Every structure is written in C-alpha cells, then in structure tokens.
A protein has these predicted regions:
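Hydrophobic core
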Residues: 12, 16-20
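Short, well-ordered beta-strand elements within core beta-sheets of diverse protein domains
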Residues: 155-161
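Residues at the start of alpha-helices and the adjacent loop-to-helix junctions
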Residues: 5-7, 18, 160
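Bacterial N-terminal signal peptides that target proteins for export
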Residues: 1-11
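A contiguous strand-loop segment
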Residues: 27-150, 171-295
C-alpha cells in the first residue's frame, strides 16, 4: 500500500507536469497506476489548458469547521447543499475572487469559486472540473439540471464531507441521483487505499470505476470509460438507469442481457484527436522537443 504522502505528491506532480501542455481552450486529466511508475506511486491530476491567464489561482487552506453542520452551501449557479457535519480541513486550489466577485459566475454571494482539486485531513483527494459532453439524444432523455451540482462545486462538497474515497463516491453519486448535474464531468476521488474515477454525461446517469494499478489513461474532455460489466460491483458503481436511458435515446451499445454497456459509445458526444496524440506521447510513440511548443 502506498503512503498518503506519495499519493499527494503525485497529484501535485501531475498537475505541474501537465502545465507544459501547449495552449488550448480545454482541459486534460491523467491517471497512471502504481504498477507503471518506477517507485510504485499512483498519479492522477488535471490541467486547465485555457491558454490565457484570465483565471488566476489560489492555493489555500480551508480550516476545519469552515462550514458548519446544517449550513446550506449556495454554489455558483443555483446548486445548494446542506452540510451534515462541521467540515473537515483541507488544502485546495481555486480561482481568485479576492476582489469579491466570482470570476466564473460574477456572483458576490459567499461561495468557493471553481475549486478544482485538493486533499482533506482524512487523506481524501479530489481532482475535478474535467468537462465532458453527452450525446444530444441522451440529453433529450435525461437533460442536465440547471440547479444541479456543477463540476466546480464537487471538490468543495466532497473534501468538506467525505472521510474516505468510497464515501466520496457515494456522496457524489447520491447528489447526481437526487439533485442532478448541471453538466458533464470526470472526477478522480482517491485515498491511501484506492482511487475511483466518476463520469456523468447526462443529468442523472453516472458510472464510477475503481481504477486498477496496471492502467494509464488520459482524458481530454472526452469519456475515458469504455465497455464495463455493471455486475462487477466490487469495481463498478453505476446509476440504475445507465442502460435504460441510452436504450430510450437509441444510443445504447453493449449487451443489455449481460448487463454490459460501452459507456463511451453510448453516452459520449464525440471523441477527439487529443486522445490518441496524448497516449502516443505517454507510450513513447511520439517525442517532443522544446521547439514543438508555442510561446
């Protein structure tokens, strides 16, 4: 079992490494299992490839009890959440609203603007805000919810509330089921024992996958989850309607009788060339020099 320090360091290392990605209006997430690193470290993270400096970042500490039991958190776009206990302390990265105005929603109410990633006192780590886009036909059946949870609010809620990665997964998927999601997202949730990856591409459907140590993947704003067995409950947690929504939309790919779905093919709007390009780089097929990067 890897130590908390190694995992936490890995999260930051990935974020810093990916910062050399060429400028683009996009985001890129990366996971490297412990079997594929020299020192047995699990690595995951995400970079904001905006190509501009319009969203300055703050790395800060949210003190224990910053949110009180029973307090209602009012997010950027109408999502609300009632905290079940005094919040855990955590360190995180968020957008800078020291001017008093949120750079994301222009709101002046008390909320955390675009909290992207962090680690709480229980050793739970979250890397969120990797935007995903569902098929129009699937969204017609299960549309996004205007006041559902938005990707930038996930880190705030989970790090405040969850004492383990598994509890974080349970909390997030419960929110998807009940309040719904305002948009699609890919989210890493990890602790000293395991790392999970959660995707949603419509308002209420989702899949959470326990990530093996032998896998590397990158996610450039497209679904990274392919064919999965929904009966593999040790490693897969999915919404009860994961198959039926896709069937109603006419987008289902898989074997319904065997409870198997190709998640990407059924829900992802479209793939892009950034996926093979990134994997070719990680696999050593392509190499890059400093001259390949724009100033």
């Amino acid at each position: 079992m890897m130590s908390f320090k190694k995992i936490a360091a890995a999260v930051m290392a990935v974020a810093m490494t990916l910062a050399v990605v060429p400028s683009a209006f996009a985001c890129t997430a990366l996971y490297v299992g412990s079997d594929l690193t020299e020192d047995g470290t699990t690595m995951f993270g995400r970079i904001e490839d905006l190509g501009t400096n319009d969203y300055n970042k703050l790395f800060y500490v949210s003190a224990a009890g910053n949110h009180k039991a029973g307090e209602v958190y009012d997010g950027c776009y109408g999502f609300t959440y009632t905290f079940t206990h005094d919040s855990y302390s955590y360190t995180a990265r968020r957008d800078d609203n020291t001017s008093g105005v949120c750079p994301d929603c222009d709101g002046t109410h008390d909320h955390t603007p675009y909290e992207e990633a962090g680690t709480n006192e229980k050793g739970v780590m979250v890397s969120a805000t990797e935007s995903l886009y569902g098929k129009d036909a699937a969204l017609a059946v299960d549309p996004y919810v205007d006041d559902g949870i938005e990707e930038a609010e996930i880190t705030t809620v989970l790090l405040s509330e969850a004492g383990t990665a598994r509890k974080g997964v349970a909390l997030l998927t419960s929110i998807y089921e009940n309040a719904g999601a305002a948009g699609g997202a890919g989210v890493f949730i990890g602790d000293q024992n395991e790392t999970w990856f959660v995707e949603n591409l419509t308002g209420h459907t989702y899949v959470a996958l326990k990530l093996p140590d032998s896998v590397v993947f990158m996610q450039p704003n497209v679904s990274a989850i392919g064919k999965i067995d929904l009966d593999d409950t040790d490693n897969v947690i999915a919404s009860a309607d994961a198959i039926s929504v896709a069937q109603e939309a006419g987008t289902f790919v898989g074997d319904a009788a065997a409870n198997v779905i190709d998640w990407n093919a059924s829900y992802n709007n479209e793939d892009n060339a950034r996926t093979p390009a990134g994997l070719n780089y990680l696999n050593g097929v392509d190499t890059y020099t400093e001259d390949n990067y724009t100033e």
